[in-house]
């Protein structure tokens, strides 16, 4: 599955200009890192060529934080996968970097107030 997404994600990350905000650069790195299960601040800061502490400071300067950007990317991707694929929720949870599907279900419910399956069904109707 990862191999299908990897080329486009690598191209997107490489095409970001130095003028992109730190949040945009973190989002791009997360899009690449999530399916491989390495969506943590250490991995993202390594991909961006800065220390984890510098990354935290830069995100803070933009009134954000790593966990907020991670949650935003996960929510966006979850909505996309549910609306445009027939992947089972367990696979979506894996692609979003969750170790346990129940963690994904709880997070999705906190974002939307409904279960992933209910959200998918609502998109169909």
Indicate where each model-derived feature is located:
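Extended mid-to-C-terminal alpha-helical interaction segments
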Residues: 1-125
